[in-house]
């Protein structure tokens, strides 16, 4: 059974069998494949705790996912900080509260291990995602994204720096 008695999708730990469906949802949402990204993500998911990757399932089908976890002192961020790396919901199931259900389940699990702050990165020109995270109480933080587009190569660097304001 993949829905509870109220018809709400079941949230569970992501399993290796979910990978193809997660990638399919990501392609539907973004409009392009990201094989290198997902290869790296699934390698990390396998090494992290079970709270770091969840899926929402309805009628035996994965309809959404969230990947995140607890800081391991990346960028000097302490362990009481949680991250949302990636969240996606099949377009056919969007605007039905699935992403909020996934987010709530993950944050409840993160709180149990001492996380009291969640961080994510969003493109400033993505109003839908910004509105979603704003509706969950997110606001601008102290981290900034620095980007360098080198004219001599195709390498793009993203550097994150903590501002001491």
Where are these regions (language model features)?
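Conserved N-terminal entry element of GNAT/NAT acetyltransferase domains
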Residues: 1-17, 153-165
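Acetyl-CoA-dependent GNAT
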Residues: 13-17, 24, 28-79, 85
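Residue-level recognition of the GNAT/N-acetyltransferase active site
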Residues: 15, 90, 94, 123
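Conserved acetyl-CoA-binding loop-helix of GNAT-fold acetyltransferases
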Residues: 89, 95-108, 135
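Conserved active-site alpha-helix within GNAT-family acetyltransferase domains
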Residues: 100, 112, 124-142
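Conserved GNAT acetyl-CoA-binding A-motif
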Residues: 110-122
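Active-site/acyl-donor-binding loops of N-acyltransferases
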Residues: 135-155
């Amino acid at each position: 059974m993949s829905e509870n008695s109220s018809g709400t999708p079941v949230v569970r730990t992501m399993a290796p069998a979910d990978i193809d469906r997660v990638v399919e949802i990501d392609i539907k949402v973004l409009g392009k494949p990201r094989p290198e990204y997902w290869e790296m993500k699934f390698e990390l998911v396998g090494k992290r705790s079970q709270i770091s990757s969840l899926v929402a399932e309805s009628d035996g089908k994965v309809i959404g996912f969230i990947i995140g976890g607890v800081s391991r002192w990346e960028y000097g961020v302490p362990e009481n900080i949680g991250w949302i790396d990636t969240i996606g919901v099949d377009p056919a199931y969007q605007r039905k509260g699935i992403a909020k259900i996934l987010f709530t389940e993950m944050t409840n699990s993160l709180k149990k291990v001492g996380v009291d702050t969640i961080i994510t990165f969003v493109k400033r020109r993505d109003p839908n995602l910004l509105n979603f995270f704003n509706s969950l109480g997110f606001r601008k933080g102290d981290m900034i994204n620095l980007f360098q587009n080198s004219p001599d190569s195709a390498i793009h660097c993203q550097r994150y720096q903590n501002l001491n304001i």
